[in-house]
């Protein structure tokens, strides 16, 4: 495994649960529930059909597989070998022909394939690495001029601590305890600055909300907890 900008404990955490990745009622249920929302948002802005797409931190391939089914040619990358094996197996079983997976760091791939992708996605990943700004820079370098770059992560404030950690992990048990570290959450202003520093132009920001009674997620202008950010690399 390439040891670049990765936390071994984070890799071990998700590797341990890799066999559960495609269980819609398992530990990754929230990812399955939010996937249609983020997929539609990305597709609405970037028009995935016929595009060459990179999914950074793809894990078991939930988003990568869905984007391929929207007509994109997708490469999913991660540094956790076990989730990648699960992603490859699922692609084979589901006959998703236009998706491939590689164990490689985005910083390394940016040197190998600069300005290569029409769309780059990095969802629910930045809060799990030691240097998220380095990931943002690599994503910018991987996008073609005019290409789209998408991020999603958690805001850092008392409300996000209460809802995303206390509520989601300890009260509602939507996620395993220890899934997230509050200190690694990222304010939208911080992420936006990293994007600008990497030469990206901000296009759209949306929040993601959850109703524990109806168990329904939706996008809104409220970015105080989970949020998504869309950028473009200038032509």
What are these regions (language model features)?
Residues 110-119:
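A short acidic, Gly/Pro-enriched loop at the edge of an enzyme's catalytic core
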Residues 133-145:
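A short glycine-rich, Lys/Arg-flanked "PGG" loop and its adjoining helix->strand segment in the class I
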Residues 1-22:
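N-terminal, positively charged/glycine-rich alpha-helical extensions of SAM-dependent methyltransferases
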Residues 51-57, 148-172:
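Conserved class I S-adenosyl-L-methionine
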Residues 32-49:
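Conserved alpha-helix/loop element of class I SAM-dependent methyltransferases that forms part
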Residues 173-190:
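Acceptor-substrate binding/catalytic loop of class I
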Residues 62-108:
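Class I SAM-dependent methyltransferase SAM/SAH-binding core
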């Amino acid at each position: 495994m390439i040891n670049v900008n990765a936390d071994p404990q984070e890799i071990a955490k998700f590797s341990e649960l890799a066999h559960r990745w495609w269980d819609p009622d398992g530990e990754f249920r929230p990812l399955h529930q939010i996937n249609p929302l983020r997929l539609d948002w990305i597709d609405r802005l970037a028009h995935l059909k016929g595009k060459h797409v990179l999914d950074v931190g793809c894990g078991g391939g939930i988003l990568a597989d869905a984007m391929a089914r929207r007509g994109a040619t997708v490469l999913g990358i991660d540094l956790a070998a076990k989730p990648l094996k699960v992603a490859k197996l699922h692609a084979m079983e589901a006959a998703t022909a236009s998706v491939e997976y590689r164990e490689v760091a985005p910083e390394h791939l940016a040197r190998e394939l600069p300005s290569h992708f029409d769309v780059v996605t990095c969802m629910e990943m930045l809060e799990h690495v030691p240097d998220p700004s380095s990931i943002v820079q690599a994503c910018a370098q991987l996008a073609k001029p005019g290409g789209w770059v998408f991020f999603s992560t958690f805001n850092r404030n008392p409300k996000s601590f209460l809802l995303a950690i206390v509520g989601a992990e300890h009260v509602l048990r939507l996620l395993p305890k220890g899934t997230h570290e509050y200190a690694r959450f990222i304010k939208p202003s911080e992420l936006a600055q990293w994007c600008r520093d990497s030469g990206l132009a901000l296009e759209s920001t949306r929040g993601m909300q959850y109703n524990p009674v109806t168990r329904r997620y939706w996008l809104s202008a409220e970015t105080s907890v989970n949020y998504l950010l869309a950028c473009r690399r200038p032509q």
